A protein has these predicted regions:
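Active-site microenvironments in enzyme catalytic cores
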Residues: 1-8, 19, 38-231, 238-243, ...
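Structural signal for terminal/edge beta-strands and the immediately following C-terminal loop/tail
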Residues: 313-339
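Short beta-strand-centered aromatic/proline hotspots
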Residues: 15
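A beta-strand-loop signature enriched in Asp, Gly, Thr, and Trp
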Residues: 211-263, 267-280
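Short, charged beta-turn/beta-strand-edge "cap" motif at the junction between a beta-strand
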Residues: 9-11, 88, 149-151, 261, ...
Length: 339
């Protein structure tokens, strides 16, 4: 099943989207918002699934042509947004870039930070930035949305609470990160609002691509119209989504609508190297910080700048038949405040 949120008020209006993303139908009579649906998932899911089947068969009353520009992030705001960092190659590169050591517990204890969830960006909203000097970066990721998760669940139990999957652009201000982390209290100013794909899908919608709590498909990223990366999301993810959810719930409950991220999707070279740009025959990257560090390693100097005002990033995922699964994150960086 595929769900989305029309821009309407602070929490939007829930709609159901056809498998090919061409049509949609309202679901407000079943649940007014996605948050409401998640809070009563077991009760409303059968009705949503029935209408989804009707939509795909062409028999849903009130169906309309879908315009992705009318969509907010599936949850325009959430009670919880916690982002992991489950890809070893990304962790190694960004830590090397700021001369930080790998944590000894990386292989057994996930990295995770708590982000701002009070006002997510829509997938086609501008990324407003105060200054280019802050080091504006995109991060292509995957995230899951849960229902109510009890405290201290096991990964096996956590898997049952994962209801939806979506993509993320976790915007980062790289120039602010070292100073903030040096204080020993984590990210804050360095992590402005994130955006999410216009469509959230149930795990079964991914078919065989959803295995062991991971999405086994490439994440496609374009920067200013040029392919920047297409790393595989599955094989190099050290911790699965059930493990990340269990980690987040180790000492606390997670309320329905909690969003848990994978961290930046990243692949090393087959020989263990840090990866190559698309132009050099590699799978590329899902963020600028990685390519900058690789340039430093390979060429002795950084060639790629961080994002500037007017730059545009596009993040998508396609199935093996070339069909867009989640819709498209398509954002331009603009100066704040606007003139």
């Amino acid at each position: 099943m595929k769900l989305a949120t029309l821009k309407q008020g602070r929490d939007g209006e829930l709609i159901i989207v056809s498998r090919d993303l061409s049509r949609a139908v309202s679901a407000v009579d079943i649940a007014p918002t996605l948050q409401a649906a998640l809070e009563s998932w077991d009760a409303v899911n059968p009705q949503l699934e029935e209408r989804y089947a009707q939509l795909n068969s062409g028999s849903a009353e009130g169906a309309f042509k879908l315009d992705q520009r009318a969509l907010h992030s599936p949850l325009p705001r959430a009670y919880q947004w916690a982002d992991g960092s489950a890809y070893l190659n990304h962790v190694q590169l960004v830590r090397q870039a700021r001369n930080a050591e790998m944590p000894e517990t990386f292989w057994t204890d996930p990295l995770m930070y708590q982000g701002g969830s009070d006002c997510f960006l829509a997938p086609t909203d501008d990324i407003e930035a105060v200054s280019e000097e802050h080091g504006i970066d995109f991060e292509g990721e995957i995230a899951v949305i849960t229902d109510d998760v009890p405290m201290a669940v096991t990964p096996e139990q956590a898997a049952k609470h994962i209801k939806l999957v979506m993509l993320v652009n976790d915007v980062s201000l790289r120039g602010l990160i070292p100073g903030e982390l040096a204080k020993g209290f984590g990210f804050f100013q360095a992590k402005p609002a994130s955006s999410f794909s216009p469509i959230a899908v149930t795990p079964d919608e991914l078919g065989d691509a959803w295995q062991d709590g991971k999405v086994h498909l490439p994440l496609t990223v374009h920067l200013n119209g040029e392919k920047f990366g297409e790393p595989e999301a599955g094989p190099d993810m050290i911790f699965s989504f059930p493990q990340l959810v269990a980690h987040a719930a180790k000492t606390r409950y997670l309320g329905a609508g909690a969003v848990i991220g994978s961290g930046t999707v990243s692949n090393p070279d087959p020989d263990g190297g840090p990866g190559k740009p698309v132009a050099d025959g590699g799978v590329g990257y899902s963020c600028l910080a990685e390519v900058r560090m690789v340039e430093q390693i390979l060429y002795g100097q950084v060639k790629t700048p961080f994002m500037r005002f007017g730059d545009r990033v596009r993040i998508e995922m396609f199935d093996r038949d070339g069909n867009n699964i989640f819709g498209t994150i398509d954002q331009q960086v603009v100066k704040y405040p606007p003139k």
